[in-house]
Each structure stands twice: as C-alpha cells, then as structure tokens.
C-alpha cells in the first residue's frame, strides 16, 4: 500500500526534499557529491498522546536551526501505516543508490504502556512524499518470543560485509535487560530475513536503548542510551558490525545533567565535523 500526503504539502516537498540531507542516517560506502546537498531534513514525533505519536518533518539550512513543515502537523497518518495507531522514533536512511529512502518507526501507542508494543514499521520511498509500508510484528513473526515486552527505536544501516541493509532495534524480554538486536531486511524492504540476533549489550549487562550507528574511517560508532543506570549517551565502536567485538568508551557524551535519550549523529555538509543531537525529553527539547 502507498501512503500519500495532502496535495498542498506534496507540492512543497516536491520542490525541495530530494536535495536534502536526511538525518541522522546516511550512506557510508558511496560518497554522494555534497555540492548537491542544500539543507537537512529532520524526522521526529512530538509527544505521548493522540497525533503526537506521528511522523513530522522539519528542515534546516545549517544543521542547527530547524523549521517545522506542514505547520508541525503529521506528514503520514499513523493509523494507516501501523498496527497500534501510533508511531514513534522515526529514522530515515538514504540508500546506496542515492535516490531511495528507507524509514523505520516504532509501532506503538504509549498510552497502552511502555511495555505494550511488539512491532515496527518499514517504509520505502523515492521522493520522501509517497511511502509504501510493512508492519513487522516480532512476536508473531518469530517463535520463542512469548515473553517479549517491547520493540523500540529501529534504525537502518548498510552492512558492506553482508551486502545488505541491517535493521537494528532494542528489545526487552521478561525481566531481563533491553538489548540491541539486528536482522537484515529483504531486497524489497518489506520484511526481515533470518532470526533477530543480539548486536550489542554493555559489558555490565544492563539495559541499552536508542542505538544510532555512524561510520567514519573504517569504524562503526554506536551511540546508545544507558537505560536505568546513568540515563545518558555513551559510545561503543567496532570495525565489523556483527563481530561482537565492541570497544566501550566510559564517559557520557551529553552536555547536560538532565535526562536524555534518542541520540542522532550526522555530518555537517561540506565539513569534516559531526553533530550529536539528543532528546532532553523531560524538557521537551533537543540539544546539540
């Protein structure tokens, strides 16, 4: 099924979005000419009730100051694309071909409880306006998931060793810790291939959520939130995504004493500099 936006908004997007730099995911293997990038696209949701749990767009010319599009209203109807009626944690990746975009979102209505969801949604587009979508319910899709409590914050990255797109997300089973898992998407980006496997868990065995992976100079950098033990953003690195050989950095990366989550890291256009942004969720704002 193809989800289409309202005509007035589609006209605006058609004029500008294809030359935007989608945040925070981007291709690591192929170097698309940065001269073709003119702005940054930010996808987000705004809260925990009603249509706040829906995909929105904002744009920026400098990577720091963003203007909401569509009067800060949803650009995709959550009730159409999800099984729960709400979506959270949107992430867009520009694919290796430079013209296809993958979006993944948490299929969840938080009013039903923080351990109520079992699914994510995979979306695909070539214009950032019209999206096909597929709901992946992990508990229904795979056996042995009877004690699954939640499926949170999926993201996508291209794995050069596998030659496939990896979807990774955090899951909680029973009374255990939230662990970041992964599975590869099929060629159509409509389903996952193989069983979900653990991608990362801190050496202390405690929960981690909101993984965000960025590749630079042969190294994959995983930014994650330490859930329930420090509640901040840390980083682990590896040269092979599925090797299990992660090196953890001990320090927290946020520059605030407030509780934070939802790290997103992206490169500034035309510069060898990166921005780490995160959600100061008790304040209702983002910080860089």
Identify the role of each PLM range.
Residues 2-13:
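Bacterial N-terminal signal peptides that target proteins for export
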Residues 12-22:
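Bacterial N-terminal signal peptides
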Residues 24-26:
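Sec/Tat signal peptide C-region and signal peptidase I cleavage site
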Residues 28-288:
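Carbohydrate-active catalytic/glycan-binding domains of CAZyme proteins
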């Amino acid at each position: 099924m193809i989800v289409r936006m309202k005509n007035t908004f589609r006209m605006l997007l058609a004029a500008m979005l294809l030359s935007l730099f989608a945040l925070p995911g981007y291709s690591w293997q192929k170097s698309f000419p940065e001269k073709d990038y003119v702005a940054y696209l930010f996808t987000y949701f705004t809260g925990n009730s009603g249509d706040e749990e829906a995909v929105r767009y904002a744009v920026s010319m400098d990577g720091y100051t963003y203007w909401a599009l569509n009067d800060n209203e949803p650009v995709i109807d959550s009730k159409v694309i999800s099984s729960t009626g709400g979506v959270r944690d949107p992430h867009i990746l520009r694919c290796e071909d430079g013209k296809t975009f993958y979006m993944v979102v948490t299929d969840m209505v938080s009013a039903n409880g923080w351990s109520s969801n079992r699914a994510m949604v995979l979306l695909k587009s070539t214009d950032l306006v019209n999206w096909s979508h597929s709901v992946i319910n992990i508990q229904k899709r795979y056996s042995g998931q009877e004690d699954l409590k939640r499926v949170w914050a999926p993201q996508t990255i291209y794995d050069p060793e596998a030659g496939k797109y990896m979807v990774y997300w955090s899951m909680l089973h029973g009374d255990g810790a939230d662990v970041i898992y992964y599975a590869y998407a099929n060629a159509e980006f409509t389903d996952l291939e193989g069983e979900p496997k653990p991608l990362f868990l801190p050496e202390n065995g405690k929960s981690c959520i909101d993984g965000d992976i960025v590749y630079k100079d042969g190294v994959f950098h995983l930014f994650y939130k330490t859930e329930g033990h420090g509640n901040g953003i840390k980083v682990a690195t590896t040269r092979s995504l599925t090797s299990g050989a992660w090196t953890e950095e001990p320090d927290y990366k946020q520059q605030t004493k407030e509780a934070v989550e939802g790290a997103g890291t992206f490169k500034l256009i035309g510069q060898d500099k990166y921005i780490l942004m995160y959600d100061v969720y008790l304040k209702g704002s983002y910080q860089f």
